[in-house]
C-alpha cells in the first residue's frame, strides 16, 4: 500500500502530465487568446462557483502552474478539516498518549491526508493560459460540486455502516480485548467519517454536512470506561534495580493509556482470593540484571545490562508478547557506569514494552509465538 506522501507525489505527477497533454492540445488557443480569462481574477461564468470548486496556480512553466492550482484546491479542504478537528480532539489526544508506538497513532495529518486524497480524486485541470507578454503560465484546477458531493456522501454512508458494525460487535462480545479493539476501531472510522463530512461541507455551496449518528467525544469516553472496567495490567519485576524498573514500566504503560494496577502480583493477595475491582487480565513480568565488566581500559569502567520480559494473559497463561534487550554503558567510575546503564535500561525496556503491549491490546500486532533469545543469558556468557 502506498503511503500518503507517495500517493500525493503520484497525483501531482499525473496533474503535471495532464498539464503537458492539455497544453499540447490547447497550445494554439494560448497564442490566439491574448486577453486573460476571467477565472484568473477569481470569477468565471464558464466555471461558475455554484457548479465548480476551483483553484488557480501560476508559475514560470505550465506543469508547475497546474501543480500549484491543484495545491490551491487541496488547501481549501485541509483548512476546513483542521478547523473542524476540535470536535475530534478527545480521541486524537487519547491517541497521542506516550511516545512508544507512533506508528499506530491516528494523527490529524493522517486524517487530513486520507480524506483530502479521496476528495481530490475528483479534481481535474479545467483551463490554462499563457501571458503573451510576460510568458507566465496560469492554470485552473477544479471539481464538479455535484459529482464530488455524491462521492463523499457514498463514502460517509460506508463509514457510518462500519461504525455501527464495530459498535455492535463491541457491545455483544464477551471477550474483553475484543470489546476494546472494536470500540477503538469504531472511533477511528468515526473520526475519518467526520473528516469526509468536513470535505462535504466545503463541496456543498450550502456548507451543510450530514449529521453523524455518534459523537467522537462520547465514544472516546466509552472507550476509556471500557478500558478501565475490562482490562488491568500488572507489572512484576525481579533482579537488580527491580523497584526502579517496575515504577518506570508502570509509568510508561499509564502514558500509553493502559490501566495499570499498583498491586504486586502474588504478594498483596492470598492465593485464590479475588481482588476488588476488575480481574487482572494481563501481566508484564521479567528480570533485569546489571554487572560490571572486566575490560582492560585504564580510563573507563563498563557496566552491562540485560532484561527479559514476557506479557502473559493471566487467565490462560498464554504468552502474547516478549521483549529481550541488553546493552553496555561506560563511564569514568563504576558508580556512574552502573547509573548510566540503569537509565538506558529503563528507557529502552519501557519503550519496547509499551509498544508491544499496546500493539497487542489494540490489535495492531500479531502476538509473538516464539520468544526472543534471552538477553541475560547471552549477556552473562559474553560478560
Protein language model annotation of sequence segments:
Residues 91-126, 266-319:
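Surface-exposed short loop/turn segments
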Residues 2-16:
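Bacterial N-terminal signal peptides that target proteins for export
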Residues 70-91, 230-285, 315-319:
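N-terminal segment of the mature soluble domain
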Amino acid at each position: 500500500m502506498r503511503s500518503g506522501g507517495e500517493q500525493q507525489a503520484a497525483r501531482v505527477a499525473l496533474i503535471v502530465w495532464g498539464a503537458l497533454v492539455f497544453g499540447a492540445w490547447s497550445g494554439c488557443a494560448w497564442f490566439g487568446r491574448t486577453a486573460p480569462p476571467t477565472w484568473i481574477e477569481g470569477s468565471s461564468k464558464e466555471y461558475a462557483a455554484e457548479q465548480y470548486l476551483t483553484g488557480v496556480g501560476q508559475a514560470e512553466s505550465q506543469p508547475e502552474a497546474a501543480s500549484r492550482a491543484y495545491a490551491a484546491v487541496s488547501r481549501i479542504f485541509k483548512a476546513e478539516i483542521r478547523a473542524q478537528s476540535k470536535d475530534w480532539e478527545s480521541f486524537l489526544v487519547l491517541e497521542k498518549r506516550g511516545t512508544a508506538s507512533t506508528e499506530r497513532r491516528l494523527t490529524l495529518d493522517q486524517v487530513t491526508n486520507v480524506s483530502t486524497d479521496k476528495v481530490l480524486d475528483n479534481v481535474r485541470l479545467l483551463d490554462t493560459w499563457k501571458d503573451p507578454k510576460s510568458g507566465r503560465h496560469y492554470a485552473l484546477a477544479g471539481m464538479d460540486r455535484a459529482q464530488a458531493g455524491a462521492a463523499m456522501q457514498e463514502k460517509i454512508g460506508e463509514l457510518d455502516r462500519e461504525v455501527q458494525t464495530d459498535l455492535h460487535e463491541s457491545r455483544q462480545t464477551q471477550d474483553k480485548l475484543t470489546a476494546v479493539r472494536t470500540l477503538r476501531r469504531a472511533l477511528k472510522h468515526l473520526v475519518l467519517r467526520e473528516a469526509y463530512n468536513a470535505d462535504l461541507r466545503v463541496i456543498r455551496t450550502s456548507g451543510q454536512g450530514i449529521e453523524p449518528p455518534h459523537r467522537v467525544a462520547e465514544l472516546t469516553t466509552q472507550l476509556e470506561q471500557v478500558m478501565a472496567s475490562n482490562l488491568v495490567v500488572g507489572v512484576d519485576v525481579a533482579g537488580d534495580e527491580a523497584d526502579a524498573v517496575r515504577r518506570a514500566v508502570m509509568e510508561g504503560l499509564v502514558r500509553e493509556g493502559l490501566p495499570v494496577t499498583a498491586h504486586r502480583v502474588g504478594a498483596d493477595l492470598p492465593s485464590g482470593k479475588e481482588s476488588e475491582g476488575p480481574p487482572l487480565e494481563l501481566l508484564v513480568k521479567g528480570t533485569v540484571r546489571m554487572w560490571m565488566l572486566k575490560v582492560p581500559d585504564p580510563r573507563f569502567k563498563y557496566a552491562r545490562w540485560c532484561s527479559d520480559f514476557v506479557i502473559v494473559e493471566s487467565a490462560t497463561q498464554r504468552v502474547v508478547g516478549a521483549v529481550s534487550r541488553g546493552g553496555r554503558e561506560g563511564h569514568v567510575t563504576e558508580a556512574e557506569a552502573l547509573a548510566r546503564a540503569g537509565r538506558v535500561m529503563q528507557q529502552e525496556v519501557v519503550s519496547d514494552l509499551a509498544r508491544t503491549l499496546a500493539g497487542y491490546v489494540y490489535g495492531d500486532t500479531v502476538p509473538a509465538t516464539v520468544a526472543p533469545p534471552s538477553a541475560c543469558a547471552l549477556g552473562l556468557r559474553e560478560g
